[in-house]
Amino acid sequence: MNGKQLRRWDTDSNGRRFEGGINDVAVAANGGAYATVFGPYADPPIPTSVIGKILYLAPGGQKWVEVANDLNYANGIGVSPDQKTLYVSQTVSNCILKFTIEADGSLSNRSNFALLNLLVKNRNDSPWLGPDSMKIDSKGNIYVAQWFGGKVLKLSPEGKLLHVFEIDAGDGTTNVAFGKNEDLYVTVVQDPKDTQAKGSIVKIRNVR
């Protein structure tokens, strides 16, 4: 790995630009990839429309194809270990959705997986409070950062809240990554309202 750019996409299969930008990507075991299109971010930053999307790039494919739409600011995304379920964060809804992954990579059976406002209380009432990026462990547990929440939630494959990791470094928890020895690394923006987005990386030991 040398950081060389292998390919770049600026539009989907219909030639449409990714409004709001590509937010997150998850790669399936077969080499296919799913990406979220966030939607417009207004100035001042007030949620404006529900037009987030999920795109799919087939193994060896050249074009990103829309496989889900009408998402309330599509954000983090992950594939279950058995490759049968796709999870996606709807940040503004403070909700995680799940889909069945079909053999051709398309998605079906859209449903609510976890309504985070029913699982955990937050002191922040920002309209942007909600799930950000996620990672899924080998047991199918979901670790999701909560933007404006200052925490990482651990959810079971059934949507049960298993643990809340409070992050003292700031309210803008954005992403998580697994490390050695069952450690979890968390990226954090100290103040989500700070236009400079000053942040840090936090290490949590023995999370799994």
Can you describe what each PLM-predicted range is?
Residues 78-95, 99, 103:
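Glycine- and Gly-Pro-enriched alpha-helical subdomains that act as flexible
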Residues 40-52, 91-94, 147-148, 193-197:
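Short, solvent-exposed loop/turn segments at conserved positions within beta-propeller repeat blades
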Residues 2-8, 60-65, 103-111, 160-163:
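Beta-strand initiation motifs
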Residues 93-95, 99-101, 114-160:
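Loop/turn-rich, solvent-exposed surfaces of beta-rich toroidal or solenoidal domains
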Residues 190-208:
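Short, basic/aromatic-enriched C-terminal tail that caps enzymatic domains
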Residues 13-34, 39-41, 48-53, 64-85, ...:
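Beta-rich, blade/repeat-based domains predominating
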Residues 52-55, 95-97, 151-153, 198-202:
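A short loop-to-beta-strand structural motif that recurs across blades of beta-propeller domains
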Residues 99-106, 205-208:
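Short loop/turn segments immediately following beta-strands, especially the blade-tip
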